[in-house]
Amino acid sequence: MKLPIYLDYSATTPVDPRVAEKMMQFLTLDGTFGNPASRSHRFGWQAEEAVDIARNQIAELVGADPREIVFTSGATESDNLAIKGAANFYQKKGKHIITSKTEHKAVLDTCRQLEREGFEVTYLAPQSNGIIDLKALEAAMRDDTILVSIMHVNNEIGVVQDIATIGEMCRARGIIYHVDATQSVGKLPIDLSQLKVDLMSFSGHKIYGPKGIGALYVRRKPRIRIEAQMHGGGHERGMRSGTLPVHQIVGMGEAYRIAKEEMETEMARLRGLRNRLWNGIKDIEEVYLNGDLEQGAPNILNVSFNYVEGESLIMALKDLAVSSGSACTSASLEPSYVLRALGMNDELAHSSIRFSLGRFTTEEEIDYTIDLVRKSIGRLRDLSPLWEMYKQGVDLNSIEWAHH
């Protein structure tokens, strides 16, 4: 077993060796290096064919028509293109958008930008387990609501939203439904021929493909229109201009092909490892599970250890690559906005750790992790005056802290 152990698969994944090998064939002079938009010679035709194959592989994983897949630079761009693109195109119908407080920053900040441009956004608070209350969603829908954006799997706590029912609710009212599926694609079954989802964002690097490539699903029947955000040569049916990065597209396609083949066995294996990890640490005193194991993705476990500072725990766990309560916001000392939206106090939010498992995680690594976490928590609490007071029965909420 090699240290450190990588348990941050929700932040990014290593490229699968099969994917890397495939990508190498699309870079150099002796490979297929052409521009897929070059129609006058075979270098272009071969590149275009490679892109078509990858587009099919992505469509097959999610039950879409390949013509509904638009390549972008990643899920952040896909979220921007979907939300701004739909809002701008349909603004004559209304200017009201609904999303949730626990979305990824790529959705929240895009909505904030639209607010500055005169749109109105309702941010729904989830229930304490992270699941959106569908009655609250229904109550928020208005005649001028044009778009709902609610993710499939949350990147911090792993809870799975009921996108099928939300889709039905939106379709019944003629509201466009966008889903950020970055964390779920290739991990949970998605069938867009059955789901009433109009726009869906995908990424390459969360599923063992390369970074810098993603896609947006744009429904054809009923036809959804979006306004392009990137202008130029009119690539991707006018929705996203820019020369297609063939090697990255091929890599994403291969990653999605592998995911389709291995998803079922892989998810059962990861669920087993995640449960093994939780069972190994759940009897530690004052440990809290954030999210919902039953309605959770099989590969994410978010846990708070009371009376332990998250930053010091990360330092103690230096043999583990994990993230503290804020994945994309790990650099800031603010507690995770996702955990705060669940109604959690700052102390617990600060002491949270996200373990995310993946294709190369082993049972041996999980057992090492359990042992290390148990020892580290014990050691840090031995040093903590707060833990000592808690053990003596002092109500820490009643203490007046002096501000120096």
Curated annotation (Swiss-Prot):
Mind telling me which Pfam families this protein's record contains?
A: Aminotran_5
The protein's location, in the record's own words, is: Cytoplasm
Q: What class of enzyme is it?
A: transferase
Q: Which UniProt keywords apply?
A: 2Fe-2S, Cytoplasm, Iron, Iron-sulfur, Metal-binding, Pyridoxal phosphate, Transferase
Please state the Enzyme Commission number of this protein: 2.8.1.7
- Classify the source by domain of life: Bacteria
Report the leader peptide range.
none
Q: Which InterPro entries match?
A: Aminotrans_V_dom, Aminotrans_V_PyrdxlP_BS, Cys_deSase_IscS, Cysteine_dSase, PyrdxlP-dep_Trfase, PyrdxlP-dep_Trfase_major, PyrdxlP-dep_Trfase_small
The active site annotation covers 328
Q: Name one GO biological process term.
A: [2Fe-2S] cluster assembly
Q: Which GO terms describe its molecular function?
A: 2 iron, 2 sulfur cluster binding; cysteine desulfurase activity; metal ion binding; pyridoxal phosphate binding
The chain residues annotated with the modification N6-(pyridoxal phosphate)lysine are 206
Q: Which SUPFAM superfamilies match?
A: PLP-dependent transferases
State its role. Answer: Master enzyme that delivers sulfur to a number of partners involved in Fe-S cluster assembly, tRNA modification or cofactor biosynthesis. Catalyzes the removal of elemental sulfur and selenium atoms from cysteine and selenocysteine to produce alanine. Functions as a sulfur delivery protein for Fe-S cluster synthesis onto IscU, an Fe-S scaffold assembly protein, as well as other S acceptor proteins. Also functions as a selenium delivery protein in the pathway for the biosynthesis of selenophosphate.
What's the protein name? Cysteine desulfurase IscS
Q: What is the lineage of its organism?
A: Bacteria, Pseudomonadati, Pseudomonadota, Gammaproteobacteria, Enterobacterales
